[in-house]
């Protein structure tokens, strides 16, 4: 889960990472009030989960509360690379002597953690890596040893930070590591990490990505979910522990196992090319179980998308046998009743497939078409969606 900047800075405060005071608002009047409360020039910053805010006009300096009001009026509603600005962070402006870069991330390729540090902050780190690779330190981190002050100082030194700020930077870097580990993050990035004229080190911007697989350890992380910006169908799926991602097509997809669902998306997209460009409407993985309740929840989510014209249920029976899946489909249709109003194309294979097919055949539901192969089922679902 990617966090907004103001949420990341909330975690900075929790872990004693020095930053500038500020608050979030969704109105221009609120921006003026916060600027008045701070009593100093402020930065008015669009809160979107995308880079390039400054170049798009989403970050402005305001010398007075009235300036903050004017900038907020201009930024709210701004479209930044497809992200519409609904919230603003109004934070105290800081005098900047130098800008640095620091991040901790999960290095999947090398199966380790990585610290990245550079004296070249305030610009895209990809640009630094491409044009000044010698100025970007990439330091592997042993999770068992962590990052103490000595190692944090070494990271800063390898990033070519000036000698006079190494000790102060080390304190901040070690606290960022504490955040990274303590909050189960996969990314903690500060760009810029600034040096003020009096040699303070401040995190002026922040990017944090949290590992959703660790949510059970962090019940407080639920507050970071931007429910207003999340698709309501995705929220409904999450309530049932279903893995759902809404797409922009017309064929609803339900499968068990991420690999099978991804393959199903491909075959439906291919089949749709000869049926007017029909495409998959979603990714929905119901996991290893396909009980009536799970299937009903999945169908309810998929059919809640007004773009869906047909549904392709593609299940391979493993631990959960095909007869159990078929029974689940029949009972799910009974549970949903009139809400199940789109044609279903069902393909079953695997454990006890013949019994599963018999159950669906005997049920003789008018919306269900049983098809033996995945390619044929994808073609039929695309055909029905294009009708």
Curated annotation (Swiss-Prot):
Cofactor(s), names only, from the UniProt record: Mg(2+)
Keywords: ATP-binding, Ligase, Magnesium, Metal-binding, Nucleotide-binding, Tricarboxylic acid cycle
Catalytic activity reported: succinate + ATP + CoA = succinyl-CoA + ADP + phosphate; GTP + succinate + CoA = succinyl-CoA + GDP + phosphate
Annotated residues for binding of Mg(2+): 191, 205
Pathway of action: Carbohydrate metabolism; tricarboxylic acid cycle; succinate from succinyl-CoA (ligase route): step 1/1
Signal peptide bounds: none
UniProt-listed GO biological process terms: succinyl-CoA metabolic process; tricarboxylic acid cycle
GO molecular function: ATP binding; magnesium ion binding; succinate-CoA ligase (ADP-forming) activity; succinate-CoA ligase (GDP-forming) activity
Any one Gene Ontology cellular component term annotated for this protein: succinate-CoA ligase complex
Domain (ATP-grasp) ranges: 9-236
Entry note: cofactor: Binds 1 Mg(2+) ion per subunit.
Plastid recorded as keyword: no
EC number(s) from the headed UniProt entry: 6.2.1.5
Binding site for substrate: 256, 318-320
The keyword Magnesium is assigned to this record: yes
Binding site for ATP: 45, 52-54, 94, 99
InterPro entries linked to this entry: ATP-grasp, ATP-grasp_succ-CoA_synth-type, ATP_grasp_subdomain_1, Succ-CoA_synthase_bsu_CS, SUCC_ACL_C, Succ_CoA_ligase-like_bsu, Succinyl-CoA_synth-like
Assembly description: Heterotetramer of two alpha and two beta subunits.
Record function comment: Succinyl-CoA synthetase functions in the citric acid cycle (TCA), coupling the hydrolysis of succinyl-CoA to the synthesis of either ATP or GTP and thus represents the only step of substrate-level phosphorylation in the TCA. The beta subunit provides nucleotide specificity of the enzyme and binds the substrate succinate, while the binding sites for coenzyme A and phosphate are found in the alpha subunit.
NCBIfam families: PRK00696.1 (NF001913), sucCoAbeta (TIGR01016)
Protein family membership: Belongs to the succinate/malate CoA ligase beta subunit family.
Record's protein name: Succinate--CoA ligase [ADP-forming] subunit beta
Gene: sucC
């Amino acid at each position: 889960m990617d966090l907004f900047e103001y949420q990341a800075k909330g975690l900075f405060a929790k872990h004693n990472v020095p930053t500038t005071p500020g608050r979030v608002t969704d109105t221009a009047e609120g921006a003026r009030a916060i600027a008045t409360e701070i009593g100093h020039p402020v930065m008015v910053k669009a809160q979107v989960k995308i880079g390039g805010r400054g170049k798009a006009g989403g970050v402005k300096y305001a010398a007075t509360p009235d300036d903050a009001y004017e900038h907020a009026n201009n930024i709210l509603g701004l479209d930044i690379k497809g992200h519409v600005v609904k919230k603003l962070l109004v934070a105290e402006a800081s005098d900047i002597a130098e800008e640095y870069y620091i991040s901790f991330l999960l290095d999947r390729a090398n199966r380790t953690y990585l610290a990245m540090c550079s004296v070249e902050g305030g610009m895209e780190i990809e640009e630094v890596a491409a044009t000044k690779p010698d100025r970007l330190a990439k330091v592997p981190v042993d999770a068992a040893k962590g990052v103490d002050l000595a190692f944090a100082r070494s990271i800063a030194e390898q990033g070519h930070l000036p000698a006079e700020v190494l000790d102060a930077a080390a304190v901040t870097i070690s606290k960022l590591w504490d955040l990274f580990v303590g909050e189960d993050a996969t990314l903690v990035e500060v760009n810029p990490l600034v040096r003020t004229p009096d040699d303070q080190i401040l995190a002026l911007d922040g990017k944090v990505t949290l590992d959703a697989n660790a949510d059970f350890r962090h019940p407080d992380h639920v507050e970071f979910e931007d429910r207003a910006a999340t698709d309501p169908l995705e929220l409904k799926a999450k309530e049932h522990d279903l893995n759902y991602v809404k797409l922009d097509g017309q064929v609803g997809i339900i499968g068990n196992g991420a690999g099978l669902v991804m393959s199903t998306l491909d075959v439906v997209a291919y089949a749709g090319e000869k049926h007017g460009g029909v495409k998959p409407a979603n990714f929905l993985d119901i996991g290893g179980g396909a009980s009536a309740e799970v299937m009903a929840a999945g169908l309810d989510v998929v059919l809640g998308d007004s773009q869906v014209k047909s549904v392709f249920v593609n299940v391979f029976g493993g631990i959960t046998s095909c007869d159990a899946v078929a029974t689940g489909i029949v009972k799910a249709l009974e549970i949903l009743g009139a809400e199940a109003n789109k044609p279903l194309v069902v393909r079953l294979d695997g454990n006890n497939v013949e019994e599963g097919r018999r159950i669906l055949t005997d049920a003789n539901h008018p919306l269900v078409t049983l098809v033996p192969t995945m390619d044929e089922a994808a073609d039929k679902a695309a055909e029905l969606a294009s009708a």
